[in-house]
Amino acid sequence: MLIKNSPLSGIYRRHSANTVEVSGWLMADDFGNPEKEQKHLQEQCVIADWSHLGKISLSGAKASSDAEKMIKGASKIKVLNTLSDQTSVAFRLTQNDYLLLTGSGNEESLLDKLKKPQSTLINQTGAMGCFALGGPRRDEVLERSTAVDLRRDRVTAGSVLQSTLHTVSCTIYRTEDLDILVHSRTFSESLFDALMDVG
């Protein structure tokens, strides 16, 4: 089986990361000091590379119909909101645009639910990077990274928005414990470096 590289593979090499194979992807396990990284997660902010997650975009007038076949209830989501099941989450970005995140390797089972897609459907897994920001200071890192007001009373858990972080266009999905950033693979290393600089 062909092993896929994370868009942060250059960062991994530069910082001597210990890597592990995750569902066919070579991903960072730690950067040499797991205890320090765990403490940082509890007290500061950490970035986890989740680029191995499956990413599928749907666009067009029938996107909601196709999204519904993939994730039950997705057609009823309001714009800039989300719906999740056990393996996937659907982001409704506009009236006619969705982005689905799913467990690594689960893309095909989602795509198999559509015998005849009625929307433009693209498997974006290899084309997009994905980070998860965790820890109590992640809000500070995001505040220093964008001009958009991301206060938790304005952007609640379950919300999704599109914004620019350090000149990189991102889709931001907020949960209770994490902020998940989906972006173009091309800009993964520069976004990672910029987030590290502010946090």
Language model: regions and residue ranges:
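Basic, glycine/lysine-rich polyanion-binding surfaces/domains
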Residues: 1-199
